[in-house]
Structure formats: structure tokens, C-alpha cells
Amino acid sequence: MKINNINLLAGVLVMGSLLTPASAWAKKAGYERLKDGVVVTAPDAKVRVRVINDKIMRVSATPEQEFKADSSLVVLPKFQGNANNPQFTVTEKKGTVEVATSQIKAVINEKNGQVKFYDHNGKELLVENQNGRTFTPRVTDGVKGYSVRQTWESLNPDEGIYGLGQHQANEFNYKDKNEELFQYNTKVSVPFVVSTDNYGLLWDSYSLCRWGNPKDYSQLGEVFKLYNKEGKEGTLTGTYIDKDGKTMVRQEPKIYFENLIRGDLAHVINLPKNFDYAGSNVTYEGYIEPSETGLYKFIMYYSGYQTIYIDGKKVVDTRWRTAWNPNSYKFQVNLQAGKKVPIKIEWEPNGSVAYCGLRVYAPVKDGEQLSWWGQMQDMIDYYFIYGKDMDDIIAGYRTLTGKAPIMPDWAMGYWQSREKYNTRDEVLGTVSEFRKRNIPIDNVVIDWLHWKQDSWGSHEFDKERFPDPKGMVDSIHDMNAHVMVSVWPKFYVTTDHYKEFDRNGWMYKGAVRDSIRDWVGPGYLGSFYDAYNPDARKLFWSQMNDHYMPLSLIHISEPT
């Protein structure tokens, strides 16, 4: 669940109000030949194109005088810096510089730094928009960087774009779609896309990123005129009916009940506090009036049951999500400027703490959706991968990021997983029952809270509920099944592991300083370790090995 908003994960960000002006630095026009590519100096940025192999090129751009030293968490070290020794040619032609291999060619415009990609037959594959990159200065905790954006022309209206990880909004083709990239329970973000037009893009960034629209979704009242159910302008009408039939009515300027109050796990920001949501029914209704005609893209945030109607039509059939773990769902509606249409949101919270939200993107111009935005980066940095088909493109991705290990046969079988097992007997009984019924099973996942309630991060089984964990694992192995345990980079302050990280300065301590307790039992203080520190990662791994490996357990993290 979200405690406040995503920006808290990155610290307080201060945005510069203007794009970096060309007058801020003086650069000599032209290009420089590198061992593995070229650097072109354009009026607003230096653009570097490096050849990785005959099918992969790396494009970097910076408004600074020099590029920052290479450092990547996802690309193999041998492809960083200029250690690579690829075969390519460089040709200067009429204001452009061409970098060509046996399979692809990049053409860089010397005037504006625009990059175009072609295959070996001269077919245009991908084209950056002219003036399609922006750098907006930002500062985070005293560290300077840029909010960056890169856009490309959409050459083929029938193109399909797939990837971006594992998201939960029921979208697969991301052409003309929007997706926010961050890590969240059941949401896995991977900044890589594959196109049906024979290319892939790896966006090398670890900040909050957005594919498509670079802006955050707007509140309804920022895009539409709102009217309550009586027709009065300014709000929607919220009607709250508790399980006993007691009714409360409020005027709602926005439907944005998505974040817990800091330090208060019992209440959601903006929702009425003096109301019992368990077993209740809530309705938000009224009218919206758009100022322009076009396709409006909505995002709903929900837990419990939620249904949405616009202009008398059910645009979102009833969706459910467990109350404590909300999800997002996206839909779009064509609306006409000046036409007021009814809107109704039906919500059953299904818990004492639940979430509801509805925000929107106004229509965007054609060609603005093939875009990548990063909240805080040193530079624009992406890899273009050519392939004869999707499998070939994925092979290029693996070339850059490392080979995918071949899984053992049992890993292709059925995995039994549930929210949690409460006792050793539950685990053994489950596997035993599968065997009795001759239902194939290869792996059982022991998820969270196998530790003592107050010991998250101890990597120890609760001895009362899971006596003799080694014997439990051996028994499962004797039934010809495997065991997997979920682990987290989260530690309660009372655990020895937290203290070990803290002594080295490897804990994010904002939640501890702010006394933010989690939702387990009475609520406990804890936080996460700094996984960007290589020594901290080694410690995390060693702690798991010390406690889990003697039990012959395999480790996973969530989401899987």
C-alpha cells in the first residue's frame, strides 16, 4: 500500500521551471569519433551513439559539457565505457553523421542531434522526434540531476509495443498507452519494450519513469467541470451508508482516497474519519463536462468492489481487490466538448481501511505517446536493439543484461502458493493432500509471516508455529516436492539484522524517524535497506544464506 506518494521513495524533489537553455553552455558544432561510436554536439545537448554489436546501439544525451562516468545496474560491465571493440563505419553526409554496422545504421543530425535508425536494407525502423528530448533540472537531497524525456515518431499505426514488466491493469499492447514504472506489491516494472516493427528499447534508468504521457494523472476537477447530483457546479456528491444504514453525505471536489495518513494506518487521506467502512456502501455521483472533444484516459485506484458508469454506460464492470492491497485499472471514454454527462462510482470498501480513486488524462495530440520520461537521471540513456523477430530482440536484451538461466524441470511444474501458511502442519498437510489426490505439485511457497510477528527481517521461522523447520523441509522433499520461501528487504528495528545494516549506514530510516508503523498486529517500526549499495547487497545475501540455506531452502522475492 502507499503511505503517501511515490515521490517519498526518492526524497523531496525540486523542479526547475525551465528547460536547460542552449545559452547555458557553449559547444563547438560537429562530431567526434570514438573507439566505439561518435559524439555529436548539438545546440542543446551532446548526443553520443555507441555501437555494442552489429544489432545493438546505445544512445546517450546530456546538457552538460561532459558525459558522466558509465555506471549501470542492469547492463553488463563489458558493454559500459569503451571496452567494447565492435565493427562499424562512420560517414559524414550533408549535415548528418552515419554510424553503420552490417545490420543497422544510425543517422545523427548534426544540427539538432536527432537520431534515426535503419536496417541494413535502408528501411526506417525508429526515428526520434526533432527537438524530442528535454532536460529539466532537479535537485534531490542536494544531488543535482535532470528530469528527462525522449520521444519518437510513431511510424506505423499498426505497430504493437509489448513489455514494461508485469502490471495489473489488463493492458498488453502499450502502443498509445501509458504506464508508470515503479515497484509495488504485484507490480513489476522493467524499462524495456519490444516492437512488432523489429526493434526493442531498453531505457537505462532506476528512477520513477513513465511510458507514454510524462505527466501524472489529473484530478477530475482539473480537467472537467464537476457538478453534484443536484446540478450545482464544483463537486460530486458522496453518499456514505454504513452497515447499519446510517447515511452521511459530503460534497467531494476530487475522488482521491489513495494514501494513508502518515503515521496513521487506520485512516486514508481525504476520507471521512467518523465513519465505519467495513460493510459499508459508498456512491460518488454527479456530472462531468469536458472542455475539449477527444479520448479521455482514466485510471481508477480501488480495493474492495468498485463499478463505474459514465454517460449512463457501465464503463468498468465490478472489480474486486483485497481491501489492504489496492490496485489500478485503466479505461478510456470519448467525450464531447461542452456536453455534460452523468458519472457514478459505486464502491463497497470491503474492509475498515480501503482505497478509492479516479483520475484522468485529457486528450493528447497524435504522436505524443511514443515517449519515455524519467523523474531523476544524469542523462538520457537508452539502447536500440534490432532483431528479425521478437525472439531475436529478446536475445539482444539478454546480451546486454546477462543470460537467462535455464530452469530445472520441476520449476516448470505446478507451484502451490497462498497468502501465508500459519503453521508447519498447514504446509505439510497441503503437500500431503496433493499427493493423496494424485494432483501433481512440484513446489510449495511459504510466504510471509513464517517468522515471529515482531521479527520481520530475522529470517527465522517462528519456533512455536514452525518447530523443526529442517524436519519440515526434509518431509516435503521426501514427498518429492520443493520448498520456496519469500524474503523481503524489510527489517524491524528490533532485529539483529536491522542493527547490522544500521551500524554500516545501510538503512533507509525515514519511516523510523517519522515513527511510521506498519499494519502487522499493533504496528511495528521498520524500514528497508539500501539495495543500491553493493556491500549492503552482499550482507543481505549472507544473512539469508546463514539462516535459510542450512534448511535447503530456495529464496524468492515478491513479486515473483
Where are the predicted features?
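Short, surface-exposed beta-strand/strand-loop-strand elements in extracellular ectodomains
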Residues: 305-315
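Catalytic domains of carbohydrate-active enzymes, especially glycoside hydrolases
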Residues: 426-449
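Catalytic and substrate-binding clefts that recognize carbohydrates or anionic sugar/phosphate headgroups
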Residues: 92-231, 245, 296-300, 310, ...
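The substrate-binding groove and active-site-proximal loops of carbohydrate-active enzymes
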Residues: 383-386, 411-424, 454-467, 520-543
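Residue-level detector of conserved catalytic or cofactor/ligand-binding positions
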Residues: 551-560
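A low-complexity, Ser/Thr/Gly/Pro-enriched, surface-exposed linker/loop concept
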Residues: 27-31, 35, 50-97, 135-138
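Active-site-adjacent "subsite" loops/lids of carbohydrate-active enzymes
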Residues: 489-551
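Predominantly extracellular/luminal regions of secreted and cell-surface proteins
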Residues: 221-265
